[in-house]
Amino acid sequence: VGSEMCIRDSAKAVEQVVSVLRDLPGAQVSVSRTPDASGDQVWVGTAETTPGIDGLVASLGGSKAATLPADGYVIASGRRSGHNVIALQGKDARGTFYAVQTLRQLVRHDKVASVTVRDWPLMPIRGGIEGFYGIPWSHQARLDQFTFYGRHKMNTYIYTPKDDLLLRAKWRTLYSGDDLARMKELVEGANANHVDFTFALSPGNDICYSSDADFKATIAKFDQLRSLGVRSFYIALDDIEPKFHCDADRQKYPNNGDGKWIADAQADYLNRLETEYVKKNGLPPLQTVPTNYSGSGEDPYKAEFGTRLDKDIRVQWTGEGVFSPSITESSVARAAQSYHTKHLYIWDNFPVNDGRRNRLFLNPLTNRDPNLYKHIDGITSNPMIEPYASMPALANYGDYTWNPTTYDAKASMSAVLDELAGGDKATRAALRVFADLNQSWPYRTPDTHAPALTAAIDAFWAVRDKGSVDSSLKDRLAAIVRLPEALAGMRQQGFFQDTRPWINAASQWARAGQHFVTMLDAIDAGDGAKATNEYLAAQKQVDLAKRPTVDDQGSDGVLHKAVIVPSVGDGVFDAFAKKASAQFAAFIGARPASAKAYSGTASSSMGQWEANSPSRMVDGNLSTLYWTNVSPEKGSYVQVDLGSVKPIGQVAVHQADDDTATGDMFYHAALEYSVDGSTWTAAGNFDSAPLIKHTFEAPVQARYVRVRATDANPGAQWVKIREFEVTPPVGVYSTNVKAAEGSSVALAFDGDVSTAFRAATPVKAGDFVSFVPAKGVTPRQAIVVGTARGEIQVRSGQTWTTIGTISDGAPFHAFAVPAGTNVEEVRLMLAAGSPAPVIREMTVVDRELKPVPTPTPTFTAAPTSGSSTGDDHGRPGYPTPTSTPSHGPRPALPSTGV
């Protein structure tokens, strides 16, 4: 394009062409309604608004746009009278606007490609429906959505946020004041970007369908919105109880138990709106979503609703389920037949995350049949609570609904990520790295989990098993660590702000991964001190990543700050941490001292989803689960009855889909136990904890154990309980040290280095912690992981031998056991006056770890200095306990450690 342009037509299309062309170096742009022979020209408009454009298109080798479907356009370019000329001709104003959007794509390296384009959509309805629960989009976010919709040739936005009381609870009330002013600005913003602002009213919770007053209230609401510029209207009848709210409806539509009664009432109300308001005012056809909005099979409600409904009314449908892993041509054809409509279109519940508010879904739209356009009017996407993070999926819908026969999910996603990132190559690469961490969509089978990260981790384990080195994981972890800085300058700042909690959590997980990798190298070198330091550093990062940092809003409309833990990495980070931690535990000989869970009868105050009954909480199978069909309210509970009063040492309640990631679960819970089911004793409170686990300092007696909600769940999330385990006490360890609240000596022998026995007070003379090694072990070293001071001793017969002293507060110590010693017990005699100890694990191993202190052994046949005579549990040399020690039968343990 040369130095001067002549642009013909009006408003938004011209404004955007000017914007595109002024970005070209040296360009001087003027706008005129007549051609200027002195410069290059860009003609913009329809045949009606721009006389002569038909002839220009023909002279440039194109075909005029008049024969195209609505929203279609033609682009033709070439030379005329010695000047470069481009024609952007639309079938209509919207088509002209879309021609400008394609022009943006044709500008490369400061030039406009010479092309001829003839383009039109295969689906007339293309866009989104703001129909989720949770924090509503901001006013600015909605305005930015309209700009994004326009650029991606999406023409529909359905306004139905669940938080707008004037759509639901107060649907008869008109907008006023600031609400009315904001609504006017939204409508104007949508219209400016050629987006149909569809106003969706949801009166179904209290409407009297046959009431003339309620009909007039509907008309009054529609009239107010029409005065603002709205021309598209919608009645939402989803998520309501199928019941009447007035005697007039009950008398006019008798309930015969077949579903037809409610269908008749709804259809008559909708038909009256279509006839007396929509058609009367020359508006586009009314739209609706019925109460039964999923499944393609026939039923009395669908048949009656569709048969009775005006044939022009558009009917929305979500697919075979509320969430549809795939939508096939045959399924849509059956649904259209079941609803008796030729105007079915899809409410697609992707990438909506109001049921999984800890997640982002940045995977591309897939598994929508390319031939759906033959049977439906279009698709609207139900996006995420995060408006800007929804843009990748929305762009996919724009591409798919425009031409599903050529839709390329991978290419579409790549293009929109680049658009959001901006022109910087490093930022684009970083955004792809982040998107890879959010690929799992749980309704899809088979699912995909962070594929690039997974490949790097798989390669790491594969070469490590062979004793080789692969750098791909280290490189990817380094890239993830840098994400907060790498994405801070991306073009679409709204996306960065939306996703920041997940970006930060990803960086923390990656730092943990780096420490785990270094830890594994230290394990290979037999360096216990370094391995322990790296493990603890990794665990610190994991703890940071698991902090709640995402805000939420419940049905009460109250915003709650930082109550949701962001889940990122599709579970791949968690799995890597779990495997690496297991290798560290094996390295130091940590094995859980465990007991088999009691059998019991499970019950719940909540209902169940499908066949997922409470009994599955106690079937001993972590792959099955109890799944509620409601969100817990304050006081809701799940419970296990042991049949009789029994001693309890530990309770573990495995929630959600994994012990390490939040999901459907109790977010605010109290663990309680009772002898009689009436009087309850609190064991602890747990917030945002997928694994509710409590080990009692001393065994308690109880018949009933329950988890009770102390508050309602954020986001109305349901609850999944995979297993509710109540186990007896285990007696391979002992102490006379009082544990801090919420802690237990058992945590020093549970095989989990992330937990710890924490003493309640500084050490007194005679305080100790001890354990009996597993039978068959030939200990070569005694290991203490934690911060404590004192002497490590081993017992053989009646003689205690001090094999080392801990005095430096370091988190790892390994002490050589004198050759030939028959170790029957190991104890840590804590140094009087030292700080309260924190002991993560005490173990023995049958190999040598380094560094190994080798002090001269000392022998003690009599009780340890400062302790009483006599012995605890019949063992020599023990002080009198100051608290009840754990005791009981000692099960045999694996030979690798405790």
Model-derived features: where do they sit?
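Short, small-residue-biased leader/transition segments that mark boundaries at the very start
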Residues: G2-I7, Q316, I564-I588
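Conserved Ser/Thr-centered positions that define the repeating blades of beta-propeller domains
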Residues: S674, Q793-R795
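Disordered, acidic Ser/Thr/Pro-rich linker "stalks" and the adjacent N-terminal cap
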Residues: A586-K646, H654-M665, G677, N685-S688, ...
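Catalytic-core regions of glycoside hydrolase
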Residues: G131-F132, A169, T173, S227-R231, ...
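Short beta-strand-plus-loop segments that form exposed binding edges in beta-rich domains
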Residues: R708-G715, L828-P835
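C-terminal non-catalytic alpha-helical accessory regions
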Residues: M413-S567
